[in-house]
Amino acid sequence: MSGHDSGNAKRGRASFGAFVRKPVERDVVASAGEAAEQGSLEAVQAWPDDAVEVGAVVDAYGLKGWIKVATHADAGRGGDALLDARRWWLERGGERLSARILQSKTHGDTVVAHAAGVSDRDAALALRGFRVFVRREDFPALAADEFYWVDLIGLEVVNEQSVALGTVSGMIDNGVHSIMRVEYPAVGKDGQPTTDERLIPFVGVYVKTVDQAARRIVVDWEADYS
């Protein structure tokens, strides 16, 4: 179970967020009707509640206003969502923009895209440094036994004896499979309350059920395991 995760091991590295899956090599092109309504970049005050950061604008691509986005992992985590979403949300400092995406495609380990209102290289270069978000609802659908990392954060973890082990605080990938970072309350050497962490491999031999509706993960893991 990987960062998008299933019972099969996936490659990729990521420190947080969405999923690990190599973006499908494809072009996504706006229809004639969409192109007729290109519009422009829009400054926004309201921000989607389900916005998930999936990359950052790192450069211009070519001379016609395309931008290059580094996704949040070597394996392209965020790439499929970037290709599927027809609107991106951009943030740099206190500035927030909404961008209608007319075309997008993979380019090596990056995603390149043409946003409405960005017509030349200078305009594309002006977007360098913007973090790129897409709405969670725009993520591609997964198989029944696959999960996006962002959906696992905050879930309670219990073992098969119903002993509470903590809460998922993050996910890491060791290159073979994903690992849950599970935080739980503890007592420090000074006798003061603190937070400790256990690492549980996110693979089928240990992870028995993931119930997103109940916000609970059941694992085969003893409370005294490190």
UniProtKB/Swiss-Prot annotation:
Protein name per Swiss-Prot or TrEMBL: Ribosome maturation factor RimM
Subunit annotation: Binds ribosomal protein uS19.
GO cellular component assignments: cytoplasm; ribosome
Biological function: An accessory protein needed during the final step in the assembly of 30S ribosomal subunit, possibly for assembly of the head region. Essential for efficient processing of 16S rRNA. May be needed both before and after RbfA during the maturation of 16S rRNA. It has affinity for free ribosomal 30S subunits but not for 70S ribosomes.
SS bond partners: none
Top-rank taxon: Bacteria
Localization annotation: Cytoplasm
Chain's gene name: rimM
Keywords: Chaperone, Cytoplasm, Ribosome biogenesis, rRNA processing
One example GO MF annotation: ribosome binding
An annotated GO BP: rRNA processing
Family assignment from sequence similarity: Belongs to the RimM family.
Domain PRC barrel stretches: 144-225
